[in-house]
Amino acid sequence: MKPLYFLVFVVAIFLSSCEQKPQSPVDAVDPFIGTGGHGHTFPGATMPFGMVQLSPDTRKDSWDGCSGYHYSDSTIMGFSHTHLSGTGVGDYGDIRLMPSTGKLQLEPGTEENTQSGYRSHFSHSSESATPGYYKVLLEDYQIQAELTTSERVGFHKYHFPQTDSAHIIIDLFEGVTSDQVLDAFIQIENDSTISGYRRTKGWANDQHLYFYASFSSPFKHFGIQHNNQNQAMKTYAQGGKIVAWVDYKTAKNTPILVKVGISAVDVAGAKNNLKAEIPHWDFELQRGNAKNSWNKALNKIKIGKSHNKEDRSIFYTALYHTMIAPNLYNDAEGRYRGHDMEIHKTDSGRHYTVFSLWDTFRALHPLFTIIERNRTAEMVRSMLDMQSKGGLLPVWELAANETQCMIGYHAVPVIADAWINGIRDFDEEKALQAMIKSANQDLHGLKWQKSLGYIPADKESESVSKTLEYAYDDWCIAIMAENLGNQQLADSFYQRAQNYKNLYDTETKFFRGRQNGGFIAPFDPAQVNFMLTEANSWQYNFFVPQDIGGHIDLMGGDEAYAAMLDSLFTGKTAITGRKQADITGLIGQYAHGNEPSHHMAYLYNYVGEAYKTQALIHQIMNELYHAAPNGLSGNEDCGQMSAWYVFSALGFYPVTPASGQYIIGVPRFDNATIELENGNTFTVEATNFSPDNKYIQQLTLNGAPYPYSFIDHETIQHGGTLRFVMGPQPDKSWASEKKHRPQRKITGDQLVATPSIKADSKTFTDSIQIRLHHPKAGAQIFYSLDGSLPTAKSQVYSDAISLTASTQIRVLAKFENKQSSAITGNFYKIPAGRTIDLATNYSPQYPAGGDIALIDRQHGNTDFRTGSWQGYQGVDLEATVDLGKRQKIKSISIGFLQDQRSWIFMPERVHFSLSVDGRNFTEIGVIPNTIPATLDGSIIKHFELDIVAHKARYVKVIAVNRKVCPPNHLGEGEPAWIFADEISIQ
């Protein structure tokens, strides 16, 4: 018996050792994290930065389904080859394949009744995913579908039951959204090959995608539905709606495999991609190749133990999500579609698409400068190529199209950050000129930013956010110019980088919107409005990464700045104003679910209170990241949400990209090692590591004391060990001395901020008092009342100015031989006695200046977000104007704006009535609407009634709201808006 006992002992030891074998990074990844809630990720198969994202489609035209998939869904419509990861706008879902059995169905059908189409129920219990692989059972057909990929090829494996009626549907019409199919064609080349093309207009205005599909077994029958007409054995169709199918007689345990190569260039490119990357039919081999590729990519950072068993999965899933986009865009032989829509070939390296730069400049691209340096150079060259062929650096680039989504010119910090961090494999002078060109446009409020030093809220939407973000981008240009030896250029952009000061209100200590020379009142920092980008004033109040020291000075010093940060994180979470789905993950008014807040927890280091940063980072990682489908607090945004976690788990974060500096936080693991591309390793260790020990007691670098709460990029690249000694109580003295804190301050010539104008209104009937203010003690304010530019010989402001006639006042300030930009205020005298009574309430989000807005003789422009239109949601507008006395009336008109993409429509009709006593009204005319609700763009229409002269004192205007958005509109059935402006009475 002894040999038997020995054998059992050996087997037990072997099994124990197997159980203790370290889990590979791929095995730790959970692609379902972020597929629920508002994460907007997809679970399907892709390669690191691959062209193909082969994933199931479960819903369409849904904000929470921007990736095509949401974990709460229970049906699948098919598997398409392109998807976006974590975006807030949907697109893609190109070239859908769907296996089915039984009656041939060529429409997706409905979720409520899957029998109405080809979609199928599925269950998460029979669904699994890992990087590069996805599997699910289509319950309605009992088909198990498996997916894997190479970089440019999707590989399908369908396990059909035994049946004479197996189908594979190829749908070129359906996508993630109801994008417009501009053109399409399909060619059934033989009994095992299909090729085609899909050209669409969606978020990307003109997207081209070609495919070449090869089937492992010849299909016995096939056909094409062209514009809803089925034709069996048809081999070609072009234009309109195209859905094809192939039929099989299948045996159990004999799967059908399909390889689909894609290309933005042509069918030949798609075919070549397929042959170059998957020339075989071994699905498991390719699945293994994908796993190996992901393991190699994820092993760039090796982590140790954490005090939370979920943390390993959260970390490696986050790292996985950072490597999904940007996406490869050139074919295997180097050809790609440029921003001029022509076909080009890469000179070296690879060409990329999907640049979500408003999000990713903050942490994703800085992460790449550490772990993806060669790829970063390729991405920078891709951006410069886009500029050379499309005119400007990308803002939000998608499939060779500039979407103009979001704000700023944030390719600039990505390029500057790469260069500052030693990535120089691109034309630096060409890069600098491209940066300057973006900054010197007149687009998107830049005209005003350049002339005034800020963007007025009535001239451009998102004026506060744009002013602040342009200032940071301009600092990046200054840094680049200075390092390239162009100091004069650098100085001019350092001045522009201080434009944030023009929006700073010393009374409230917030950045505020301005119009007519003054700050807009009333002011509520918790209010979400169109002066800000997906945020309220709290969530933009600390976006001065280029001049944190200057911002601290404005607030009154370290203590005042720290107190304001305390208020941010400890205040009430209530949000006022318009609804904004992106504002999630709240800690006080800090919103981790959206990007503007991401750096804020690290700002305490700048005022010597690093222990507060440590506590907050610990809290955010504990509360706002989980190993669950709804484990992200907001949109993944092409890797930014996850890049925050990767950096923070390592113990540092890039508060100011392009500074070459990272701010120390608190690590999540007892050790983590970064494998650098130069052959060095940088290790972060944490001793006394436990859930309660969240505070730094000591920091050492390569064994020597390191008292600083920041670390340089160059130090990381040299390799070494950064060791944290942790404890349960804060060491408030650690890194509290100024010499140990990070310093980020513009030290050259200081900008003289613009003065501000204070007045109760911009209209008056008798007189109005105007006051001028400048935040700098000792600054002189000069003004003119005749519209001329003030000079040193102009009047010097000393006390309130009384106006009794319509006047344009121009104002500037001088301090220490420097002067500010000149600002302008226009004040209008309107006839006395005219008043307005509103029987219906306008939305508090869109007051346009209050009740008087409809008779203030000011007219709105084509952008409703500038605040000059009065908005009514789901209700009619009923207004009665009292002229003060009985007058002869010849015409009445009222202006309306339509922007159907924002659910704003023309009224169905406008009724006009007159009265002499304000009680008894006579309707004198009705003007019907003639603008179709489907007409796109921003449209202004004046509903005008010319009448035979009537005498009346009261004029009533009723604009009939359609109440709900029309059928087939994205907001169908939801409350509709009407936006009104000036009622003119002649």
Predicted segments, located by residue:
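Extracellular Ig-like/FN3 beta-sandwich strand-entry sites
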Residues: 719, 804-808, 950-952
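Short acidic/polar inter-strand loop motif in beta-rich domains
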Residues: 730-733, 816-819, 961-968
